[in-house]
A protein has these predicted regions:
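Catalytic machinery of carbohydrate-active enzymes
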Residues: 1-187
Length: 187
């Protein structure tokens, strides 16, 4: 794992490394209050929602939006509301998700990282692509399902004690750090 490699570097320069703590993030009161205000329907405080992050920095790490829509529909059948986040420049994926889904989904493309941290800390579950948001969810102790595409899942999986599941399909060309798939074309 990347964290183990970084800790090994510290050990290499002579600093004893006896503990390998997992990632942890604190939630600020300010961020929690801002998210609570944005979530007018009350689902934030009762925590009966799943957080989805259906976007990714690279096409090779992107699970199809339709699959996230089916996930939201399944969660709704279980009585769990779906909230999806993305950045401003990823707003199209949120629009596509809402269009593809047969159930209502609350979306945000304007939250700060502290606000996403607060939101993730209240979620019953996180489902998303391999991304920084997946690491945030894991670091606040939220159970995570992380979908890996081209990147090295052993190296980049969330570093957490929280329940987590890594979902992937094995390809002979993995791991691949590419922005685009050179083996299969469109990912």
């Amino acid at each position: 794992h990347s964290a183990e490699q970084q800790l090994a570097l510290i050990g290499f320069v002579g600093v004893p490394v006896e503990d390998r703590p997992k990632s942890r993030l604190a939630v600020t009161d300010t961020a929690a209050d801002q998210v609570r205000t944005a979530c007018v329907s009350g689902w934030y405080d009762d925590g009966n929602f799943a957080l989805l992050h259906p976007s990714s920095a690279f096409a090779t790490k992107q699970w199809p939006t339709e699959n996230f829509a089916r996930t939201a529909e399944y969660l709704a059948e279980q009585g769990i509301h779906t909230v999806a986040v993305a950045s401003k420049n990823e707003g199209k994926v949120l629009e596509d998700l809402k269009r593809e889904s047969k159930v209502p989904i609350t979306t945000f493309d304007d939250l700060t990282l502290p606000e996403i941290t607060a939101l993730a800390s209240k979620a019953r579950l996180f489902v998303g692509n391999d991304s920084g948001i997946a690491h945030i969810a894991a670091a606040v102790g939220t159970p995570t399902v992380v979908i890996f595409g081209s990147s090295n899942r052993n190296h980049w999986r969330p570093w957490t004690d929280a329940p987590n599941e890594i979902v992937f399909e094995e390809f002979a060309c993995q791991p691949c750090p590419g922005y685009e798939c050179k083996e299969f074309g469109d990912a």
